[in-house]
Amino acid sequence: MAITRPTLDQVLDIRTQLHMQLTHEQAASYLELMQPSFDAYDLVDELADFVPPIRYDRSSGYRHRPSAKENPLNAWYYRTEVNGAREGLLAGKTVALKDNISLAGVPMMNGAAPLEGFVPGFDATVVTRLLDAGATILGKATCEHYCLSGGSHTSDPAPVHNPHRHGYASGGSSSGSAALVASGEVDIAVGGDQGGSIRIPSAFCGTYGMKPTHGLVPYTGVMAIEATIDHVGPITGNVRDNALMLQAMAGADGLDPRQAAPQVDDYCSYLEKGVSGLRIGVLQEGFALANQDPRVADKVRDAIARLEALGAHVEPVSIPEHNLAGLLWHPIGCEGLTMQMMHGNGAGFNWKGLYDVGLLDKQASWRDDADQLSASLKLCMFVGQYGLSRYNGRYYAKAQNLARFARQGYDKALQTYDLLVMPTTPITAQPHPPANCSITEYVARALEMIGNTAPQDITGHPAMSIPCGLLDGLPVGLMLVAKHYAEGTIYQAAAAFEASVDWRTL
Protein backbone atom coordinates (compact mmCIF):
# COMPACT_ATOMS: atom_id res chain seq x y z
CA MET A 1 0.00 0.00 0.00
CA ALA A 2 1.42 3.38 -1.01
CA ILE A 3 1.53 6.20 1.49
CA THR A 4 -0.26 9.42 0.63
CA ARG A 5 2.03 11.86 -1.18
CA PRO A 6 2.01 15.54 -0.23
CA THR A 7 0.60 18.15 -2.57
CA LEU A 8 2.43 21.31 -3.54
CA ASP A 9 0.27 23.28 -1.13
CA GLN A 10 1.27 20.93 1.68
CA VAL A 11 4.95 21.41 0.85
CA LEU A 12 4.41 25.16 0.99
CA ASP A 13 2.75 24.73 4.38
CA ILE A 14 5.72 22.66 5.60
CA ARG A 15 7.96 25.46 4.34
CA THR A 16 6.21 27.82 6.74
CA GLN A 17 6.43 25.35 9.62
CA LEU A 18 10.19 25.10 9.03
CA HIS A 19 10.62 28.90 8.95
CA MET A 20 11.85 28.86 5.34
CA GLN A 21 11.30 31.04 2.30
CA LEU A 22 10.65 29.12 -0.94
CA THR A 23 9.11 30.08 -4.24
CA HIS A 24 6.44 27.86 -5.77
CA GLU A 25 8.98 26.74 -8.34
CA GLN A 26 11.50 25.77 -5.66
CA ALA A 27 8.82 23.95 -3.68
CA ALA A 28 7.85 22.00 -6.80
CA SER A 29 11.46 20.95 -7.28
CA TYR A 30 11.66 19.69 -3.72
CA LEU A 31 8.37 17.86 -4.12
CA GLU A 32 9.81 15.96 -7.09
CA LEU A 33 13.04 15.23 -5.21
CA MET A 34 11.06 13.86 -2.25
CA GLN A 35 9.53 11.00 -4.24
CA PRO A 36 12.39 8.44 -3.85
CA SER A 37 12.19 8.90 -0.09
CA PHE A 38 8.49 8.16 -0.19
CA ASP A 39 9.18 5.02 -2.21
CA ALA A 40 11.17 3.85 0.83
CA TYR A 41 8.18 4.74 3.02
CA ASP A 42 6.02 2.55 0.78
CA LEU A 43 8.35 -0.39 1.40
CA VAL A 44 8.29 0.17 5.17
CA ASP A 45 4.51 0.32 5.01
CA GLU A 46 4.30 -2.99 3.12
CA LEU A 47 6.60 -4.98 5.42
CA ALA A 48 5.30 -6.75 8.51
CA ASP A 49 6.36 -5.14 11.76
CA PHE A 50 9.19 -6.84 13.65
CA VAL A 51 7.96 -7.34 17.22
CA PRO A 52 8.38 -10.17 19.75
CA PRO A 53 6.04 -13.15 19.39
CA ILE A 54 3.35 -13.78 22.00
CA ARG A 55 4.75 -16.75 23.91
CA TYR A 56 1.88 -17.56 26.26
CA ASP A 57 -1.51 -18.44 24.82
CA ARG A 58 -4.47 -16.25 25.66
CA SER A 59 -6.97 -17.48 23.10
CA SER A 60 -8.96 -19.21 25.84
CA GLY A 61 -8.70 -16.41 28.37
CA TYR A 62 -11.64 -14.11 28.97
CA ARG A 63 -11.44 -10.31 28.78
CA HIS A 64 -13.90 -8.42 30.90
CA ARG A 65 -14.25 -4.87 32.13
CA PRO A 66 -15.74 -5.33 35.60
CA SER A 67 -18.90 -3.56 36.70
CA ALA A 68 -18.94 -1.17 39.65
CA LYS A 69 -20.39 -3.94 41.81
CA GLU A 70 -17.55 -6.27 40.84
CA ASN A 71 -14.96 -3.53 41.31
CA PRO A 72 -15.76 -1.58 44.52
CA LEU A 73 -12.31 0.03 44.72
CA ASN A 74 -12.29 0.82 40.98
CA ALA A 75 -8.84 -0.78 41.10
CA TRP A 76 -9.37 -3.03 38.06
CA TYR A 77 -9.44 -1.70 34.51
CA TYR A 78 -9.73 -5.06 32.78
CA ARG A 79 -9.93 -8.63 34.05
CA THR A 80 -8.44 -11.58 32.22
CA GLU A 81 -6.41 -14.69 33.00
CA VAL A 82 -3.08 -15.53 31.41
CA ASN A 83 -1.28 -18.54 32.84
CA GLY A 84 2.49 -18.68 32.88
CA ALA A 85 4.96 -21.53 33.19
CA ARG A 86 4.12 -24.41 35.51
CA GLU A 87 7.25 -23.84 37.58
CA GLY A 88 9.35 -20.85 38.54
CA LEU A 89 10.11 -18.25 41.18
CA LEU A 90 6.54 -16.95 41.07
CA ALA A 91 4.64 -20.21 40.54
CA GLY A 92 1.19 -19.92 42.10
CA LYS A 93 1.35 -16.12 42.42
CA THR A 94 -1.40 -13.98 40.94
CA VAL A 95 -0.43 -10.62 39.50
CA ALA A 96 -2.02 -7.38 38.30
CA LEU A 97 -0.32 -5.16 35.74
CA LYS A 98 -0.46 -1.38 35.89
CA ASP A 99 -2.50 -0.31 32.89
CA ASN A 100 0.39 1.38 31.13
CA ILE A 101 1.98 -2.06 30.59
CA SER A 102 1.24 -3.90 27.35
CA LEU A 103 -0.48 -7.27 27.62
CA ALA A 104 -1.21 -8.49 24.10
CA GLY A 105 -4.89 -8.84 23.30
CA VAL A 106 -6.10 -7.03 26.42
CA PRO A 107 -7.18 -3.35 26.27
CA MET A 108 -4.85 -0.71 27.69
CA MET A 109 -6.10 2.77 28.60
CA ASN A 110 -3.37 4.22 30.85
CA GLY A 111 -6.10 5.94 32.86
CA ALA A 112 -6.82 8.29 29.96
CA ALA A 113 -9.83 8.54 27.64
CA PRO A 114 -7.77 9.22 24.48
CA LEU A 115 -6.40 5.66 24.70
CA GLU A 116 -9.80 4.01 25.19
CA GLY A 117 -10.04 1.08 22.80
CA PHE A 118 -6.32 0.53 22.28
CA VAL A 119 -5.30 -3.14 22.35
CA PRO A 120 -1.55 -3.95 22.41
CA GLY A 121 -0.20 -6.40 19.87
CA PHE A 122 2.72 -7.73 21.94
CA ASP A 123 3.71 -8.24 25.57
CA ALA A 124 5.98 -5.98 27.57
CA THR A 125 9.25 -7.63 28.57
CA VAL A 126 8.21 -7.67 32.24
CA VAL A 127 5.03 -9.53 31.27
CA THR A 128 6.96 -12.29 29.51
CA ARG A 129 9.40 -12.56 32.41
CA LEU A 130 6.63 -12.82 35.01
CA LEU A 131 4.94 -15.54 32.97
CA ASP A 132 8.27 -17.31 32.51
CA ALA A 133 8.57 -17.29 36.32
CA GLY A 134 5.21 -19.03 36.71
CA ALA A 135 2.93 -16.12 37.60
CA THR A 136 -0.71 -15.94 36.55
CA ILE A 137 -1.85 -12.55 35.29
CA LEU A 138 -5.38 -11.68 36.40
CA GLY A 139 -5.72 -8.35 34.64
CA LYS A 140 -4.85 -4.70 34.27
CA ALA A 141 -4.92 -2.42 37.32
CA THR A 142 -6.37 1.06 37.02
CA CYS A 143 -3.76 3.82 36.95
CA GLU A 144 -3.91 7.59 36.96
CA HIS A 145 -4.46 9.77 33.89
CA TYR A 146 -1.29 9.23 31.84
CA CYS A 147 0.37 8.39 35.20
CA LEU A 148 0.61 12.08 36.14
CA SER A 149 -0.69 12.05 39.72
CA GLY A 150 0.34 10.95 43.18
CA GLY A 151 -3.34 11.02 44.16
CA SER A 152 -5.88 8.52 42.86
CA HIS A 153 -8.62 10.91 41.72
CA THR A 154 -7.43 11.55 38.13
CA SER A 155 -8.11 8.22 36.44
CA ASP A 156 -10.70 7.98 33.71
CA PRO A 157 -13.45 7.17 34.40
CA ALA A 158 -13.45 7.21 38.23
CA PRO A 159 -11.20 7.50 41.30
CA VAL A 160 -9.51 4.52 42.94
CA HIS A 161 -10.36 4.03 46.61
CA ASN A 162 -8.00 3.16 49.44
CA PRO A 163 -8.70 -0.33 50.84
CA HIS A 164 -8.26 1.07 54.35
CA ARG A 165 -10.84 3.84 53.91
CA HIS A 166 -13.32 4.29 51.08
CA GLY A 167 -13.29 7.77 49.61
CA TYR A 168 -9.60 8.26 50.36
CA ALA A 169 -6.67 8.19 47.97
CA SER A 170 -4.91 4.92 47.33
CA GLY A 171 -1.98 6.95 46.01
CA GLY A 172 -0.80 7.23 42.46
CA SER A 173 -0.10 6.76 39.83
CA SER A 174 0.01 2.97 40.34
CA SER A 175 -3.21 3.40 42.27
CA GLY A 176 -4.96 0.18 41.35
CA SER A 177 -1.80 -1.92 41.65
CA ALA A 178 -1.28 -1.11 45.33
CA ALA A 179 -4.99 -1.23 46.15
CA LEU A 180 -5.36 -4.72 44.68
CA VAL A 181 -2.38 -6.06 46.62
CA ALA A 182 -3.48 -4.39 49.87
CA SER A 183 -7.02 -5.71 49.52
CA GLY A 184 -5.78 -9.24 48.81
CA GLU A 185 -7.29 -9.46 45.33
CA VAL A 186 -3.87 -10.35 43.91
CA ASP A 187 -0.62 -11.51 45.48
CA ILE A 188 1.67 -9.13 43.61
CA ALA A 189 1.47 -6.26 41.12
CA VAL A 190 3.65 -4.31 38.75
CA GLY A 191 3.81 -0.53 39.06
CA GLY A 192 5.60 2.30 37.31
CA ASP A 193 7.45 5.21 38.89
CA GLN A 194 8.43 8.58 37.42
CA GLY A 195 7.88 10.77 40.48
CA GLY A 196 7.01 8.25 43.18
CA SER A 197 4.24 6.25 41.55
CA ILE A 198 5.24 2.89 43.02
CA ARG A 199 6.20 4.19 46.44
CA ILE A 200 3.37 6.66 47.08
CA PRO A 201 0.53 4.13 46.67
CA SER A 202 2.57 1.63 48.65
CA ALA A 203 2.85 4.14 51.50
CA PHE A 204 -0.86 5.01 51.36
CA CYS A 205 -2.07 1.40 51.08
CA GLY A 206 0.45 -0.40 53.31
CA THR A 207 2.29 -2.42 50.67
CA TYR A 208 5.95 -2.94 49.80
CA GLY A 209 6.91 -0.95 46.72
CA MET A 210 10.36 -0.96 45.09
CA LYS A 211 11.49 1.59 42.52
CA PRO A 212 14.60 -0.15 41.21
CA THR A 213 17.74 1.52 39.95
CA HIS A 214 17.01 3.29 36.68
CA GLY A 215 17.38 0.74 33.90
CA LEU A 216 17.58 -2.37 36.09
CA VAL A 217 14.17 -3.58 34.93
CA PRO A 218 13.46 -3.16 31.20
CA TYR A 219 10.76 -0.63 30.39
CA THR A 220 10.14 -2.20 26.99
CA GLY A 221 6.43 -2.36 26.22
CA VAL A 222 5.48 0.13 28.93
CA MET A 223 4.12 3.52 27.86
CA ALA A 224 6.81 6.14 28.34
CA ILE A 225 6.52 9.49 30.07
CA GLU A 226 10.17 10.62 29.87
CA ALA A 227 12.86 8.01 29.31
CA THR A 228 15.35 9.33 31.86
CA ILE A 229 12.85 9.02 34.73
CA ASP A 230 10.84 5.98 33.60
CA HIS A 231 10.98 3.06 36.06
CA VAL A 232 8.97 -0.14 36.48
CA GLY A 233 9.01 -2.33 39.58
CA PRO A 234 7.21 -4.61 42.06
CA ILE A 235 4.43 -3.91 44.57
CA THR A 236 3.80 -6.74 47.02
CA GLY A 237 2.36 -7.68 50.39
CA ASN A 238 5.69 -8.80 51.85
CA VAL A 239 9.41 -8.37 51.30
CA ARG A 240 10.16 -11.87 50.00
CA ASP A 241 7.62 -11.64 47.20
CA ASN A 242 9.10 -8.27 46.27
CA ALA A 243 12.61 -9.71 46.04
CA LEU A 244 11.39 -12.71 44.03
CA MET A 245 9.50 -10.47 41.67
CA LEU A 246 12.49 -8.19 41.09
CA GLN A 247 14.65 -11.27 40.51
CA ALA A 248 12.25 -12.39 37.81
CA MET A 249 12.00 -9.02 36.07
CA ALA A 250 15.53 -7.56 36.31
CA GLY A 251 18.21 -7.62 33.64
CA ALA A 252 18.89 -6.34 30.14
CA ASP A 253 16.57 -7.26 27.28
CA GLY A 254 18.48 -5.53 24.48
CA LEU A 255 15.45 -3.46 23.52
CA ASP A 256 15.37 -0.65 26.11
CA PRO A 257 17.70 2.35 25.69
CA ARG A 258 17.33 3.11 29.41
CA GLN A 259 19.48 0.09 30.21
CA ALA A 260 23.28 0.31 30.37
CA ALA A 261 24.69 -3.03 31.58
CA PRO A 262 22.32 -3.41 34.56
CA GLN A 263 23.79 -5.34 37.49
CA VAL A 264 21.46 -8.10 38.70
CA ASP A 265 21.93 -9.61 42.16
CA ASP A 266 20.56 -12.58 44.12
CA TYR A 267 18.06 -10.50 46.06
CA CYS A 268 16.64 -13.26 48.24
CA SER A 269 20.11 -13.99 49.61
CA TYR A 270 19.87 -10.75 51.61
CA LEU A 271 16.63 -11.54 53.40
CA GLU A 272 18.10 -13.37 56.39
CA LYS A 273 21.18 -11.21 56.95
CA GLY A 274 19.70 -8.83 59.50
CA VAL A 275 20.80 -5.23 59.95
CA SER A 276 23.58 -5.65 62.49
CA GLY A 277 26.44 -3.44 61.35
CA LEU A 278 24.48 -1.66 58.62
CA ARG A 279 25.12 2.09 58.54
CA ILE A 280 21.92 4.08 58.13
CA GLY A 281 21.79 7.82 57.50
CA VAL A 282 18.60 9.60 58.55
CA LEU A 283 18.09 12.21 55.83
CA GLN A 284 17.33 15.50 57.56
CA GLU A 285 15.92 17.13 54.43
CA GLY A 286 13.49 14.23 54.16
CA PHE A 287 11.81 15.31 57.40
CA ALA A 288 11.70 19.02 56.54
CA LEU A 289 9.06 19.24 53.81
CA ALA A 290 6.66 22.16 54.24
CA ASN A 291 3.64 19.85 54.57
CA GLN A 292 5.30 17.28 56.82
CA ASP A 293 2.76 15.87 59.27
CA PRO A 294 4.70 15.59 62.57
CA ARG A 295 2.74 12.46 63.47
CA VAL A 296 3.94 10.76 60.28
CA ALA A 297 7.49 11.85 61.09
CA ASP A 298 7.16 10.37 64.58
CA LYS A 299 5.99 7.01 63.19
CA VAL A 300 8.94 6.95 60.82
CA ARG A 301 11.42 7.88 63.56
CA ASP A 302 10.01 5.08 65.70
CA ALA A 303 10.63 2.65 62.83
CA ILE A 304 14.19 3.91 62.46
CA ALA A 305 14.70 3.42 66.19
CA ARG A 306 13.58 -0.18 65.75
CA LEU A 307 16.21 -0.70 63.06
CA GLU A 308 18.77 0.73 65.46
CA ALA A 309 17.60 -1.64 68.19
CA LEU A 310 18.06 -4.51 65.74
CA GLY A 311 21.73 -3.61 65.41
CA ALA A 312 22.01 -0.92 62.73
CA HIS A 313 24.24 2.10 63.29
CA VAL A 314 22.00 5.14 62.83
CA GLU A 315 22.90 8.82 62.62
CA PRO A 316 21.60 11.98 60.93
CA VAL A 317 22.90 13.10 57.56
CA SER A 318 22.27 16.15 55.40
CA ILE A 319 22.17 16.00 51.60
CA PRO A 320 21.23 19.44 50.22
CA GLU A 321 21.10 17.91 46.74
CA HIS A 322 17.96 16.02 47.80
CA ASN A 323 15.92 19.21 47.48
CA LEU A 324 17.71 20.17 44.27
CA ALA A 325 16.85 16.82 42.68
CA GLY A 326 13.18 17.37 43.45
CA LEU A 327 13.27 20.78 41.78
CA LEU A 328 15.06 19.38 38.74
CA TRP A 329 12.03 17.19 38.12
CA HIS A 330 10.14 20.24 36.82
CA PRO A 331 12.22 21.03 33.69
CA ILE A 332 13.16 17.39 33.10
CA GLY A 333 9.71 15.93 33.70
CA CYS A 334 7.61 18.69 32.16
CA GLU A 335 9.66 19.35 29.03
CA GLY A 336 10.53 15.68 28.65
CA LEU A 337 6.95 14.41 28.80
CA THR A 338 5.71 17.20 26.55
CA MET A 339 8.18 16.06 23.90
CA GLN A 340 8.15 12.28 24.35
CA MET A 341 4.68 11.38 25.59
CA MET A 342 2.65 14.12 23.92
CA HIS A 343 4.39 15.55 20.83
CA GLY A 344 6.20 12.22 20.39
CA ASN A 345 2.96 10.23 20.79
CA GLY A 346 4.25 8.05 23.62
CA ALA A 347 7.49 7.11 21.89
CA GLY A 348 9.59 10.07 20.84
CA PHE A 349 12.58 9.69 18.55
CA ASN A 350 16.34 9.10 18.45
CA TRP A 351 16.60 5.80 20.28
CA LYS A 352 17.04 2.18 19.23
CA GLY A 353 14.77 -0.48 20.65
CA LEU A 354 11.20 -1.74 20.41
CA TYR A 355 8.61 0.84 19.32
CA ASP A 356 4.87 0.21 19.64
CA VAL A 357 3.55 1.61 16.37
CA GLY A 358 -0.08 0.92 17.28
CA LEU A 359 0.25 2.80 20.55
CA LEU A 360 1.91 5.69 18.75
CA ASP A 361 -1.01 5.87 16.31
CA LYS A 362 -3.59 5.78 19.11
CA GLN A 363 -1.79 8.28 21.33
CA ALA A 364 -1.76 10.81 18.48
CA SER A 365 -5.53 11.12 18.98
CA TRP A 366 -5.08 13.19 22.16
CA ARG A 367 -5.04 16.23 19.89
CA ASP A 368 -8.63 15.55 18.81
CA ASP A 369 -9.95 16.62 22.21
CA ALA A 370 -7.09 18.00 24.29
CA ASP A 371 -9.57 19.67 26.64
CA GLN A 372 -10.29 16.26 28.18
CA LEU A 373 -6.71 15.88 29.44
CA SER A 374 -6.38 16.01 33.22
CA ALA A 375 -5.49 19.27 34.96
CA SER A 376 -2.26 17.78 36.32
CA LEU A 377 -1.16 16.76 32.81
CA LYS A 378 -2.19 20.12 31.37
CA LEU A 379 -0.10 21.90 34.01
CA CYS A 380 2.97 19.86 33.08
CA MET A 381 2.34 20.50 29.40
CA PHE A 382 1.96 24.25 29.90
CA VAL A 383 5.27 24.37 31.77
CA GLY A 384 6.96 22.06 29.28
CA GLN A 385 5.69 23.78 26.16
CA TYR A 386 6.71 27.19 27.51
CA GLY A 387 10.20 25.93 28.33
CA LEU A 388 10.57 24.39 24.89
CA SER A 389 9.17 27.27 22.87
CA ARG A 390 10.56 30.21 24.84
CA TYR A 391 13.93 28.77 25.89
CA ASN A 392 14.44 26.06 23.24
CA GLY A 393 14.94 23.28 25.78
CA ARG A 394 18.04 24.82 27.38
CA TYR A 395 16.67 24.32 30.89
CA TYR A 396 15.87 20.68 30.21
CA ALA A 397 19.45 20.25 29.04
CA LYS A 398 20.96 22.11 31.97
CA ALA A 399 18.74 20.26 34.44
CA GLN A 400 19.97 16.94 33.03
CA ASN A 401 23.54 18.11 33.66
CA LEU A 402 22.62 19.15 37.19
CA ALA A 403 20.96 15.77 37.75
CA ARG A 404 24.44 14.25 37.60
CA PHE A 405 25.52 16.74 40.28
CA ALA A 406 22.52 15.79 42.42
CA ARG A 407 23.38 12.12 42.02
CA GLN A 408 26.90 12.88 43.26
CA GLY A 409 25.40 14.29 46.45
CA TYR A 410 23.59 11.04 47.12
CA ASP A 411 26.58 8.95 46.06
CA LYS A 412 28.88 10.82 48.43
CA ALA A 413 26.59 10.14 51.38
CA LEU A 414 26.23 6.52 50.32
CA GLN A 415 29.99 6.08 50.55
CA THR A 416 29.52 6.50 54.31
CA TYR A 417 26.09 4.93 54.73
CA ASP A 418 24.61 1.72 53.38
CA LEU A 419 21.11 3.20 53.41
CA LEU A 420 19.35 6.53 53.64
CA VAL A 421 15.94 6.66 55.35
CA MET A 422 13.09 9.16 55.46
CA PRO A 423 9.27 9.27 55.28
CA THR A 424 8.01 8.05 51.92
CA THR A 425 5.32 10.71 51.97
CA PRO A 426 4.90 13.63 54.39
CA ILE A 427 1.21 12.82 54.87
CA THR A 428 -1.10 9.82 54.97
CA ALA A 429 -3.85 9.22 52.42
CA GLN A 430 -6.18 12.18 52.02
CA PRO A 431 -9.86 12.30 50.99
CA HIS A 432 -10.56 12.47 47.28
CA PRO A 433 -11.34 16.02 46.20
CA PRO A 434 -14.97 16.54 45.13
CA ALA A 435 -15.74 16.04 41.46
CA ASN A 436 -16.49 19.76 41.07
CA CYS A 437 -13.33 20.95 42.82
CA SER A 438 -11.23 23.81 41.51
CA ILE A 439 -8.24 23.26 39.25
CA THR A 440 -6.04 24.37 42.14
CA GLU A 441 -7.41 21.73 44.51
CA TYR A 442 -7.33 19.03 41.84
CA VAL A 443 -3.65 19.65 41.13
CA ALA A 444 -2.71 20.10 44.79
CA ARG A 445 -4.16 16.68 45.64
CA ALA A 446 -2.23 15.18 42.74
CA LEU A 447 1.19 16.55 43.71
CA GLU A 448 1.19 17.25 47.46
CA MET A 449 2.98 14.03 48.41
CA ILE A 450 5.92 13.77 45.96
CA GLY A 451 8.57 15.81 47.82
CA ASN A 452 10.66 12.83 48.96
CA THR A 453 9.95 10.46 46.08
CA ALA A 454 10.66 12.54 42.98
CA PRO A 455 14.39 13.05 43.77
CA GLN A 456 15.33 9.37 43.28
CA ASP A 457 13.64 9.33 39.88
CA ILE A 458 16.02 12.11 38.88
CA THR A 459 19.15 10.50 40.39
CA GLY A 460 18.15 6.92 39.52
CA HIS A 461 18.84 5.47 42.99
CA PRO A 462 16.81 2.47 44.14
CA ALA A 463 14.19 3.36 46.73
CA MET A 464 11.59 1.26 48.51
CA SER A 465 8.58 2.12 50.66
CA ILE A 466 7.77 -0.28 53.47
CA PRO A 467 4.80 0.04 55.84
CA CYS A 468 5.85 1.06 59.34
CA GLY A 469 2.62 1.75 61.20
CA LEU A 470 -0.89 3.14 61.17
CA LEU A 471 -2.02 6.68 61.88
CA ASP A 472 -5.76 7.05 62.49
CA GLY A 473 -6.19 3.75 60.67
CA LEU A 474 -4.18 4.76 57.60
CA PRO A 475 -0.75 3.33 56.71
CA VAL A 476 2.54 5.22 57.02
CA GLY A 477 5.51 4.45 54.78
CA LEU A 478 9.24 4.40 55.57
CA MET A 479 11.49 4.87 52.53
CA LEU A 480 14.88 3.18 52.17
CA VAL A 481 17.37 4.43 49.55
CA ALA A 482 20.63 2.73 48.51
CA LYS A 483 23.45 2.93 45.99
CA HIS A 484 22.73 2.15 42.37
CA TYR A 485 22.11 -1.60 42.01
CA ALA A 486 22.15 -2.13 45.80
CA GLU A 487 18.54 -3.28 46.00
CA GLY A 488 19.75 -6.25 48.04
CA THR A 489 20.79 -3.96 50.90
CA ILE A 490 17.34 -2.39 50.89
CA TYR A 491 15.75 -5.84 51.09
CA GLN A 492 18.13 -6.72 53.92
CA ALA A 493 16.81 -3.90 56.11
CA ALA A 494 13.21 -4.22 54.96
CA ALA A 495 13.13 -7.93 55.78
CA ALA A 496 14.67 -7.38 59.21
CA PHE A 497 12.07 -4.75 60.06
CA GLU A 498 9.23 -6.88 58.71
CA ALA A 499 10.35 -9.90 60.75
CA SER A 500 10.62 -7.88 63.95
CA VAL A 501 7.02 -6.69 64.20
CA ASP A 502 3.59 -6.64 62.57
CA TRP A 503 3.49 -3.08 61.23
CA ARG A 504 -0.27 -2.98 61.69
CA THR A 505 0.25 -2.95 65.47
CA LEU A 506 2.48 0.13 65.42
Curated annotation (Swiss-Prot):
One of its GO terms (molecular function) is amidase activity. Keywords: Hydrolase. InterPro entries: Amidase, Amidase_CS, Amidase_dom, AS_sf. The active site is at residues 98, 173, 197. It is an enzyme of class 3 (hydrolase). Its EC number is 3.5.1.4. Pfam families: Amidase. It catalyses: a monocarboxylic acid amide + H2O = a monocarboxylate + NH4(+). PROSITE patterns: AMIDASES. Transmembrane segments: none annotated. PANTHER family: AMIDASE, TRANSAMIDASE. Belongs to the amidase family. This is Amidase.
